[in-house]
Design a protein with these regions (language model features):
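Polybasic, low-complexity binding patches
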Residues: 563-571, 583-624
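Extended C-terminal regions of large enzymes
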Residues: 424-522, 600
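Short cysteine-rich loop/turn motifs with clustered Cys
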Residues: 524-555, 577-579
Length: 626
């Protein structure tokens, strides 16, 4: 069998399907369960180098948008095109047997929130990326069982909005208004390699061969610099997991001072805190996202003590310094504190304080810059694709920052600035066409009326701006959405947790974001717009099976094929799972039987398939009763 090199990006839950496809889910569940019980793991390499794990790594890597990024050897995922599965597996098993990573390509990207400053990024070669993916697939379930509940960065099913919700809950419910901001100076560049490997050992990862390989990864030569003696290579697949392992010790040290403090008497949750308040212990809670963390305290005195204690602990235990300029104590009743692009504070409401949030000034500046840069691109390449890229940026910004209570006002401010650039740079492109006086539509007759625009932004006033026949999403069109706390039961390594993931994780926005970013070239503007509208209309589900669609497994079908006179109209399109689409067009009996066996359709679904087959001028499928 030839290794598949179909290069598409996948949503989060597709990795669950990949794991099930290669029979690795049960293995991961077992590792998680045993790690929860405190077991140590001495023989992990046989799992890491297993055939199924290597093939799963390839499947996960090839669907990542970075799969076409070259390392120092100039190769991408396409180098494996045409390889058999056996050849591919044996190649990587031999690499593991005597592993020596290639050098890492160094590049620089703008810092988040500081576009004028750059941060280094190390890009491993493709072979090394697959090896790191093999390792992380086995290590992640072990580490997830040991990580603290209130660490949210680079972890499955957790996001920045969960961290924001946690911080605001501590301000609202627990009434903790003194925030300790600790900024670790150059965290990723200063991680102690020896300490990290000892932390992995303490976490139960005790396979010496694996520890040796990770040591080699940490000391991979950086192009033009040499071999590092400290730090984790930013840009590597395994780096986020390693950074969480380093700071997990800090998480539990902080937590054990109050939140998870053990007591002689087995109190219930609420009674335990009441008892602790009567002691001399200091009350505080923390929330962490990667190396960005907040410690929320009851009063300034406690905050000052915690600030000093954390500073000393980081230096003595991890050899890390804090940045004096960026580390501080903030009273959020008087001043805002920045966290993950949000500015958090509290305001008086009656007799109590209520948490509020805005987009931080740094984040607003970054968004203005990015939008203006894309407008410059459109000025030189006025194509529907580039305008859709702008729309994808706007939608992505709205989806991230809509949990800020002041997001509407903030985006109106951004819109005011960016609209000037839009007007001056694209004034010729947005010139109004003549409109039928009898028409009630705010759009010129020659402009395509976008269903996508109507579904997401139709309730907003104002005349839509149109460039290259595509309506630009209104930058000001963002409404507040209450951030939700993370549900601990959601877990990709338990059957019950996976059910919650499939039930609760809405994929519609991620699918639409993907469709906006990946136009089908050679297709009409009408088709590219209607397929996006249709995705929202079908709520991201297959029209036949009702199952949730994913990027790796979905196709847009013309009910009446274009060769038979069909159009790109909304009513002539339908989103289907790939296997359903193949069944509709199948004419050979063996092929039909194959997909019927895969799909196992009920009578209702088969009726829908036959309706679509007849529209495509194919014969109905008749299933004979046994």
């Amino acid at each position: 069998m030839t290794v598949d090199t179909n290069l598409e990006r996948q949503p989060k839950q597709q990795k669950l399907r990949n794991a099930e496809y290669y029979d690795m889910q049960d293995v991961m569940d077992k590792l998680y369960e045993e790690s929860c019980k405190g077991k140590s793991f001495h023989n992990l390499m046989h799992l890491i180098t297993s055939e199924n794990n290597i093939l799963l790594a390839f499947r996960n890597i090839k669907n990542n948008k970075g799969s076409m990024t070259k390392g120092t050897d100039g190769k991408t995922i396409t180098q494996y095109k045409g390889w058999s599965e056996e050849q591919f597996v044996k190649y990587f098993q031999s690499k593991f047997a005597n592993y020596h990573p290639k050098s890492v390509r160094r590049t620089e990207i703008p810092k988040v929130g500081q576009p004028d400053k750059m941060r280094p990024l190390g890009i491993p070669c493709m072979d090394d990326r697959i090896i790191q993916q093999c390792i992380i697939q086995v290590l992640e379930p072990i580490c997830e069982a040991r990580f603290h509940a209130h660490s949210y960065g680079f972890r499955p099913n957790r996001s920045a909005s969960h961290a924001i919700a946690r911080a605001q809950s501590l301000m609202n419910v627990s009434k903790l208004h003194y925030v300790v901001d600790v900024d670790i100076k150059g965290f990723f560049d200063n991680v102690n390699h020896g300490k990290l490997l000892k932390q992995m050992w303490a976490m139960g990862i005790r396979d010496k061969s694996l520890i040796c390989i990770i040591g080699k990864i940490l000391k991979s030569e950086i192009e033009g610099i040499g071999r590092p003696d400290k730090g984790t290579p930013q840009g590597g697949i395994i780096s986020p997991l390693l950074s969480n392992i380093v700071l997990n010790e800090l998480d539990w040290w902080l937590s054990d001072q109050w939140e998870t403090k053990s007591t002689r008497y087995p109190y219930t949750h609420s009674h335990k805190y009441e008892a602790l308040k009567k002691s001399n212990l200091k009350e505080f809670f923390f929330v962490r996202y990667a190396d960005d963390f907040k410690i929320l305290c009851r009063d300034y005195k406690t905050a000052k003590k915690i600030f000093i204690a954390v500073k000393e602990w980081l230096w003595e235990r991890l050899g890390l310094e804090i940045s004096p300029e960026k580390s501080k104590i903030t009273n959020v009743r008087k001043k805002k504190t920045d966290f993950l692009g949000f500015a958090l504070y509290v305001t008086k409401k009656g007799k109590k304080y209520v948490s509020k949030s805005n987009i931080s000034e740094k984040a607003k500046k970054t968004m203005k810059t990015k939008l203006k840069e894309q407008i410059k691109v459109i000025q030189h390449d006025t194509s529907p694709h580039q305008v859709s890229q702008l729309n994808a940026m706007i939608l992505g910004m709205h989806n991230y920052y809509n949990t800020a209570t002041g997001c509407s006002r903030d985006f109106r401010e951004i819109n005011f600035v960016v609209s000037k650039s839009l007007k001056h740079r694209l004034r010729v492109k947005t010139k109004k066409a003549k409109r039928n006086k009898n028409s009630k539509s705010p759009l010129p007759e020659k402009v395509l009326k976008s269903r996508t625009y109507q579904q997401f932004y139709g309730s907003y006033g104002g005349k839509p701006k149109v460039v290259a026949g595509v309506q630009i999403f209104p930058i000001y069109g963002c409404k507040f959405v209450t951030p939700r706390m993370f549900t601990r039961e959601v877990n990709k390594y338990t059957p019950q947790g996976r059910q919650l993931i499939h039930k609760n994780l809405s994929t519609v926005h991620s699918l639409i974001q993907y469709l906006l970013e990946t136009k089908e070239y050679g297709k009409s503007v009408e088709y590219n717009d209607n397929r996006i509208s249709l995705m929202a209309g079908q709520n991201g589900k297959c029209a036949v099976t009702g199952e949730t669609l994913c990027i790796f497994d979905m196709e847009c079908h013309h009910k009446k094929p274009k060769k038979l006179g069909g159009t790109d109209e909304y009513r002539n399109l339908v989103w289907l799972k790939s296997d359903v689409h193949k069944l509709i067009h199948a004419t050979e009996e063996d092929t039909i039987a194959k997909y019927l066996d895969i799909l196992k359709l009920d009578d209702k679904a088969l009726k829908k398939v036959n309706s679509l087959r007849l529209s495509a001028e194919n014969l109905e499928i008749v299933v004979k009763a046994n």
